[in-house]
């Protein structure tokens, strides 16, 4: 037990105690507001509002609120959206599509968005593998339809590495962000920090949506946070637990009061959200974040990554 740490406080993610603990609520790592990247790395959908009007698409915010924002809906609304931008008469990587789907971590996110999990805690609080289920198989089949059988979805682009804002990341992870920035797609999936890193100079207004549900019977929208976000842990070698505990709690509390609002309320909600509806969507998305024990501890090579190609 670490003195002064209180996971009931609002500067700690509820998922820390709900999903990242084991046994009698033991936690090896925790996610708090000091780890600002846990907000930046949250997955969502983006859609081009100007193009949505051009293609006479209904108000997608209403679709979300009505519980009809599903993978089937995404396939239906994008299936006939296409434009031959390079004029070669062929559907290829240089054309405009209804949806551009990155086939890496943004694809993995559908597992949680559709109500699936890698592990869940049993009655004793011990994480158990729940990945190999009929539910997971159904999600995979649905994603196959989205990525390989829907003509309105593009899964490959020929972008240069120089178009990535961080030279350390491979361009394959950002085909959705670049396509959206360059007005080559109606919608895409990505992380919230793309609003700052890629879309600040986008020529048209866009909206922010949660990941779609598996079907309308699913009650809630869910999302996950990409693995590049920070988390907090205390080394076993620490001797002055009182000092570490009170400083850790204080830093998270002050970030909650000062830093988090500057990023979330000012940057994301004010500078990079174009309407009040996107602000409401942001609150929904952030409140629905899941930190799956099986994803956090799989070291980028576990079952979590079976979805991506």
Please place each PLM-identified region on the residue numbering.
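Short, solvent-exposed loop/beta-turn-alpha elements that line the ligand-binding surface or hinge
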Residues: 2-10, 64-66, 117-138, 216-222
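Beta->alpha turn/N-cap motifs
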Residues: 103-104, 189-195
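Extracytoplasmic/periplasmic solute-binding protein
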Residues: 12-45, 53, 70-128
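Extracytoplasmic/periplasmic substrate-recognition and gating elements
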Residues: 198-266
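Aromatic-glycine-rich donor-binding/catalytic loop that engages nucleotide-sugar donors
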Residues: 50-64
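Glycine-centered hinge/linker elements that transmit conformational signals in sensory
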Residues: 71, 75-80, 110-112, 117-169
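Paired acidic/hydrophobic, glycine-rich loop segments that form the ligand-binding mouth/hinge
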Residues: 185-191, 207
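C-terminal capping/gating helix-and-loop segments adjacent to ligand/active sites or protein-protein/ligand interfaces
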Residues: 261-309
